[in-house]
């Protein structure tokens, strides 16, 4: 089961890299950023598609998108001098709270109990 969480982590990391490279491509010369964006976002969807084999789709997608937005925003501030207003901080805080609630509200499906037949009476 852990491999699927690792795949989800890879999906998140490649989504962050792909989205940041989109911004990098828009402010720099050449096509390197666009190529990196295409490769990373493609890999992100591939990793996500494998992760949802064992992780609930709603949970996987919420984590993928939510954690992606959080880190893309933080890296955009650090790398591209974008602003981080109080309203953005409040939104990110709400996002993190939502991710925690979605993850904590997910239960594993119970395995069906085996019926024991002690013989016909």
UniProtKB/Swiss-Prot annotation:
- Can you provide one Gene Ontology molecular function annotated for this UniProt record? choline transmembrane transporter activity
* Record flagged with keyword Transmembrane helix: yes
The observed outcome of changing residue 45 to L is: Decrease in spermidine excretion
User: Which GO BP annotation is one of this protein's?
Assistant: spermidine transmembrane transport
The record, for Pfam families, names: Multi_Drug_Res
Q: Where in the cell is it found?
A: Cell inner membrane
Query: Which Cys residues form disulphide pairs?
Result: none
Give me the segments passing through the membrane: 2-22, 32-52, 55-75, 82-102
Topological category with respect to the lipid bilayer: Multi-pass membrane protein
Please describe, based on the UniProt annotation, the reported consequence of changing residue 15 to Q: Decrease in spermidine excretion
Presence of the UniProt keyword Metal-binding in the record:
no
Q: What induces it?
A: Induced by spermidine.
Q: InterPro entries annotated for this entry?
A: Small_drug/metabolite_transptr (IPR000390), Small_multidrug_res (IPR045324), Spermidine_export_MdtJ (IPR023740)
> Per its UniProt record, what Gene3D superfamilies does this chain match?
1.10.3730.20
Periplasmic side residue ranges read 23-31, 76-81
What superkingdom heads the lineage? Bacteria
Q: Name one GO cellular component term.
A: transmembrane transporter complex
Q: What is its main location?
A: membrane
Its assembly, as annotated, is: Forms a complex with MdtI.
Family according to the record: Belongs to the drug/metabolite transporter (DMT) superfamily. Small multidrug resistance (SMR) (TC 2.A.7.1) family. MdtJ subfamily.
- Function of the protein: Catalyzes the excretion of spermidine. Can also confer resistance to deoxycholate and SDS.
Q: What is this protein called?
A: Spermidine export protein MdtJ
Q: Which organism is it from?
A: Escherichia coli (strain K12)
Q: What is the lineage of its organism?
A: Bacteria, Pseudomonadati, Pseudomonadota, Gammaproteobacteria, Enterobacterales
């Amino acid at each position: 089961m852990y491999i699927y969480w690792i795949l989800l982590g890879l999906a998140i990391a490649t989504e962050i890299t792909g989205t940041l490279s989109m911004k990098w491509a828009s402010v720099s010369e050449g096509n390197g950023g666009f190529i990196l964006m295409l490769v990373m976002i493609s890999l992100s969807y591939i990793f996500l598609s494998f992760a949802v084999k064992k992780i609930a789709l709603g949970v996987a997608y919420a984590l993928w998108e939510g954690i992606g937005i959080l880190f893309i925003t933080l890296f955009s501030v650090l790398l591209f001098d974008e602003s981080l207003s109080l309203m953005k901080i409040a939104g990110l805080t709400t996002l993190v709270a939502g991710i925690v609630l979605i993850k904590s509200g997910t239960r594993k499906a119970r395995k069906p109990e085996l019926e024991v037949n002690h013989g016909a009476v």
